[in-house]
A protein has these predicted regions:
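Mid-to-C-terminal alpha-helical segments outside catalytic/metal-binding sites
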Residues: 1-15, 39-57, 220-228, 242-280
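A generic "structured core" feature
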Residues: 16-17, 124, 128, 238
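Hydrophobic faces of well-ordered beta-strands that scaffold small-molecule active sites
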Residues: 17-21, 58-61, 84-88, 108-112, ...
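Conserved, mostly hydrophobic/aromatic
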Residues: 20, 73, 110, 132, ...
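Alpha-helical scaffold segments that flank or form the walls of functional sites
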Residues: 32-80
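Short, acidic/polar
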Residues: 40-48, 92-102, 179-180
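Active-site gating/metal-coordination segments in enzymes
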Residues: 67-153, 196-203
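Catalytic pocket-lining loop regions of alpha/beta-barrel enzymes
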Residues: 122-231
């Protein structure tokens, strides 16, 4: 039933990419550190959503449910090598051979999820960053506003590209909205930080007045930093009991772009191609 959450969306440009989705399978054990799980959600299930939305590429993100066991990620990537890339989860004990195998499988980054904390901590960042840099990968971060503000000096000084998940959770802490926004803008001004326009319901609940403010922030980002924005569906929306309509969320972003075809192509095609090593 998972794919049925999608409605109908406006047309996307050719080679549009979903930069944040997950798969789940009962064939792989849930990590002892996991705080979130999901019913099975396969690549075949996702293909229904992908086709309906008009997407041709996707980025498979290792969910916290599997910790550092990236076997499902690698197996899934092997089925669509030209149109998919992966973001893995590793800890500081990872070997060069393991990193090389992930690289061959199509992995282009590692993720630190500090919201549903599990297998990794930010204390591992400095040890892993040189390996990431050597491979030409990036570091993807899921942080709450207070942690983003605290980590900002480290991220600004990082020698690797940084990708912030889920609108950087901009409006998730109302008392920190202004400081979070300023922190985000300063990081993006370095030219080394990307923002993922994914899961707006995690940045602010749809029934919260701040939800509209989130899209006002997005308009400002499009005007000033469109070359550092990518979009992701967050399918299959494991944090949500009532699943959102993927097409409705996508359409809202498309309306915000106000028929700016250059911005749309940047967010859905050109930027993902650069960040995730796709051919343009």
């Amino acid at each position: 039933m998972i794919p049925s959450t999608v409605g109908h969306s406006a047309a996307l440009p050719d080679l549009a990419c979903d930069c944040h989705m997950h798969v789940f399978s009962d064939a792989y054990p849930i990590a002892a550190t996991a705080t979130l799980g999901s019913p099975p959600a396969s690549l075949a299930d996702y293909a229904v959503v992908q086709q309906t939305l008009g997407l041709q590429r996707h980025v498979l993100v290792q969910p916290s449910a599997y910790g550092t066991d990236n076997r499902l990620l690698m197996q899934t990537l092997s089925t669509t090598p030209s149109t998919a890339r992966g973001v893995a989860v590793v800890d500081s004990a990872v070997s060069d051979a393991e990193l090389a195998a992930l690289d061959r499988a199509g992995v282009v980054g590692i993720r630190f999820n500090q919201v549903q904390q599990g297998a990794t901590t930010m204390e591992m960042f400095d040890a892993l960053a040189p390996h990431v840099n050597e491979l030409g990968w990036h570091v993807q971060l899921h942080l709450m506003p207070s942690e983003l503000i605290r980590q900002a000096p480290r991220l600004a000084a990082a020698k690797v590209p940084i990708v912030l998940d889920h609108y950087a959770r901009l409006c998730a802490s109302p008392e920190l909205i202004d400081e979070t926004w300023l922190t985000l803008i300063r990081l993006m001004a370095t030219g080394n930080t990307w923002l993922k326009l994914s899961a707006p319901y995690l940045a602010s609940r749809p029934d919260d007045p701040a939800f509209s403010q989130l899209f006002e922030f997005t308009q400002r980002l499009v005007r000033g930093h469109v070359d550092r924005l990518v979009w992701g569906s967050d399918w299959p929306h494991v944090t949500e009991t009532s699943k959102p309509d993927d097409a409705q969320l996508l359409n809202r972003l498309q309306r915000l772009l106000a028929e700016d075809s250059a911005a749309e192509r940047a967010i859905f095609c050109r930027n993902p191609a650069a960040l995730y090593h796709f051919d343009e």
